[in-house]
Amino acid sequence: MKPHFRNPVERMYQDTFSDNFYNRPILSHRNTVWLCYEVKTKGPSRPPLDAKIFRGQVYSKLKYHPEMRFFHWFSKWRKLHRDQEYEVTWYISWSPCTKCTRDVATFLAEDPKVTLTIFVARLYYFWDPDYQEALRSLCQKRDGPRATMKIMNYDEFQHCWSKFVYSQRELFEPWNNLPKYYILLHIMLGEILRHSMDPPTFTSNFNNELWVRGRHETYLCYEVERLHNDTWVLLNQRRGFLCNQAPHKHGFLEGRHAELCFLDVIPFWKLDLHQDYRVTCFTSWSPCFSCAQEMAKFISNNKHVSLCIFAARIYDDQGRCQEGLRTLAKAGAKISIMTYSEFKHCWDTFVDHQGCPFQPWDGLEEHSQALSGRLRAILQNQGN
């Protein structure tokens, strides 16, 4: 029988960290959960009061899970410091299981002076509806204090390496595809928690002025429908938004465009090959040449998926970008310019609007008409 790792340890070996915190979304034979924690009093730049590691087996009794071990220790320690407010941070190899997630939510509800931030390397059973609901319950904010859950990126892995690993002063060396796996998990967690976009982010990036400066990011909102009895049925669990990854962010040396990040995550949806699906994207910029080529390849290789793209603006509509849009349309994608109807739909669906209605900006319809004419000319190979 394997030990239950009752006592916390201060550090782990390098191979142990690299093996157990490897962030490939689908991973087998990682049955030990490692939970690195830091506890500090609330306040800016306060040093941690305690920082150690709990371990536990995935399939052991609940009380042996590292999350429960932490709260068993913390509850006893908390009795001596009842009036103090604390910030707790976890860096954990697997996100908590369903039962642990519910127990964590209960603990936080009963002790509002404790806030918890959870950085996870991988998501546990992210496809299970009951687990998704448990995560949403844990992370909801409006009914009281809850946890904040995020996916570990390069900075968190580097921090754990320095704080919890026998690093021998060696620098953390990220494994192949760490940034790509981070983005996949980040998108999937956003779907589960139903993240919403800030209103200023939407209005700034989706403004459809004909000539804009300083809009270097591409935002992509998406939703998926399945054909059922000749009717398109919206799949609520398959909608969200993402943006491109800038160079040197999250470990990407060269950056990655939003459309490619989106294509990366679709295989994890496990769409039924015998069903028909319609994917609709609302993008702040139309795809560049390379992204258009990749999207064309995708729909050519996945005949059960149709693609509709509504763009707020046309990206660099000269030369190869025009060619890319024509290639994408020829492959079967429907490409259109966003109008008031699509802007309002995105506002209602993807933005944390707090009940405020969509307010169109000056010139929205005029800009949409002008851009629609330009797009028609491009797709008809007439130039400007």
UniProtKB/Swiss-Prot annotation:
Q: What Enzyme Commission number(s) apply to this enzyme?
A: 3.5.4.38
Q: Name one Pfam family in it.
A: NAD2
Which leading EC class covers this enzyme?
hydrolase
Recorded hits in Gene3D superfamilies, A to Z, give: Cytidine Deaminase, domain 2
Q: Any signal peptide, and if so, which residues?
A: none
Q: Where in the cell is it found?
A: Cytoplasm; Nucleus; Cytoplasm, P-body
Region Necessary for homooligomerization: start and end of each range?
209-336
Q: Which UniProt keywords apply?
A: Antiviral defense, Cytoplasm, Hydrolase, Immunity, Innate immunity, Metal-binding, Nucleus, Phosphoprotein, Repeat, Zinc
| Domain free text | The CMP/dCMP deaminase domain 1 mediates RNA binding, RNA-dependent oligomerization and virion incorporation whereas the CMP/dCMP deaminase domain 2 confers deoxycytidine deaminase activity and substrate sequence specificity.
The entry describes its oligomerization and partners as:
Homodimer. Homooligomer. Can bind RNA to form ribonucleoprotein complexes of high-molecular-mass (HMM) or low-molecular-mass (LMM). HMM is inactive and heterogeneous in protein composition because of binding nonselectively to cellular RNAs, which in turn are associated with variety of cellular proteins. The LMM form which is enzymatically active has few or no RNAs associated. Its ability to form homooligomer is distinct from its ability to assemble into HMM. Interacts with APOBEC3B, APOBEC3F, MOV10, AGO2, EIF4E, EIF4ENIF1, DCP2 and DDX6 in an RNA-dependent manner.
Name listed for the protein in its UniProt record? DNA dC->dU-editing enzyme APOBEC-3G
Annotated organism of origin: Pan troglodytes (Chimpanzee)
